[in-house]
Amino acid sequence: MERSHLPETPFDLAHSGPRFQAQSSGNGSVLDNVLPDMAHLVNPYWSRFAPMDPMMSKILGLFTLAIMIISCCGNGVVVYIFGGTKSLRTPANLLVLNLAFSDFCMMASQSPVMIINFYYETWVLGPLWCDIYAGCGSLFGCVSIWSMCMIAFDRYNVIVKGINGTPMTIKTSIMKILFIWMMAVFWTVMPLIGWSAYVPEGNLTACSIDYMTRMWNPRSYLITYSLFVYYTPLFLICYSYWFIIAAVAAHEKAMREQAKKMNVKSLRSSEDCDKSAEGKLAKVALTTISLWFMAWTPYLVICYFGLFKIDGLTPLTTIWGATFAKTSAVYNPIVYGISHPKYRIVLKEKCPMCVFGNTDEPKPDAPASDTETTSEADSKA
């Protein structure tokens, strides 16, 4: 695939970063301090923009450092707890473990590289590391998104289908994880062998798939990639949680009607919605889908802006979109790990200071069959 070529510049690291005075002069282009070995990868579109304010680079660097620490600690603890506790190594929790592992690898592979480039205010690691960085972002991002999808579908299978559903076994869970990684590897390798390419983004401190070149090759990749790595898992997540909430709402309604027939106020010890299975599942569903949208949709919109030649795309918007997408690695351990009651119990045993609030599971006064069904739904939430 033909790429844009720019003339080599007399740029060197000694005059980059905070010491590069031309950055603050208000003159020149963002491409003025691109390294010669990266010049042929940069799209000429970005030449119209002035260099990013050095203060913004510092802010982005500190923000990236903060989310890296939070994410690596949070996901590291989830991997340690779920992987090191035999009672938690269930088929469903293997998917949670896979999600935490991919999120950990995402931040461990992306954040240090971004911080280095934020300091120098350009990509200083060469074309090879551009491919490695962008490839890791694509690989672990795809694994995380599809892990979330498989988790949602597992909840759908247990809560909606119930005894009519096929229980997931360790073997089934491992097969799903292998499928996720094989698909992610496929989409990661394609730009390396000619279907699209990995190139620097507008601010020159990060690399991603090429969404600026006006050719069918990169366009076809981005459209197909977004179909399989965004729209398909999004549809499956929404589909699963829609029927989960509907099923639990029907169960709650049946319990209330049964309570009326028995001439009691409730079959539960409390009608507090926050403590009911319906309330918990609704919160998890809303949180999951909302955070998923918040993290990834802005970056997809940025890619489509470039794909369809829409004005308004700037180096600053591209880097904030890329950085914000990575915050999904911070949300996931909270949604999928800390909300897990048994996880909180084990975490309190191994690290009491890491747990806030009560870790005791509620014990409603209900018939055994109702309690068992509700507890199963709660644990899946």
From Swiss-Prot:
Compartment(s) of residence: Membrane
Name of the protein: Opsin Rh2
Residue positions with a glycan: 27
Membrane topology value: Multi-pass membrane protein
InterPro entries, A to Z: GPCR_opsins (IPR050125), GPCR_Rhodpsn (IPR000276), GPCR_Rhodpsn_7TM (IPR017452), Opsin (IPR001760), Opsin_RH1/RH2 (IPR001735), Retinal_BS (IPR027430)
Its biological purpose: Visual pigments are the light-absorbing molecules that mediate vision. They consist of an apoprotein, opsin, covalently linked to cis-retinal.
TM stretches of this protein: 57-81, 94-119, 134-153, 173-196, 221-248, 284-307, 315-339
Gene Ontology terms: biological process: G protein-coupled receptor signaling pathway; phototransduction; visual perception
Assigned protein family: Belongs to the G-protein coupled receptor 1 family. Opsin subfamily.
Tissue expression pattern: Predominant opsin expressed in the dorsal ocelli.
